[in-house]
Amino acid sequence: IVDFMRSYSSDPVADFRELYRRLIFTILVSNKDDHLKNHGFLYVGAGQWRLSPVFDVNPAPDRNPHLETAILEGGAHDRSINLALEACAFFEIPAAEAREMIRATARRISDGWREALRQVGVSGGMARDYEPAFMSDQMEEALAV
């Protein structure tokens, strides 16, 4: 995806950062539906494309330790904040900026997941059932990175 964006995005730097945030988000919410068909592009004219809005994110409380799509082509499929941090250069993001993106995303998720569920009518026992999708060892690592 990054290679496509390098060649065809009208704003590759912004798209790299957005894709990296989505990778972090996928890890931190235990998204079980992270395959390549769930990344789209919108045509903006003159042979240029932009990353589409995010779609089809499915938090999974069972915390599958593997991603459907490897972080780097030919790489491990581990659901790992540390691997995401190691991959930041591929997204042309400096390590210090990647760490801040990881921490900020983790804070936003850990501070807001209960309210987000409440807003869509999920509360009580069902919300507690989803807690492992949002509060995990990867969340702890992300907050401390």
Label every PLM stretch briefly.
Residues 1-36, 40-145:
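Anionic ligand-binding catalytic core segments
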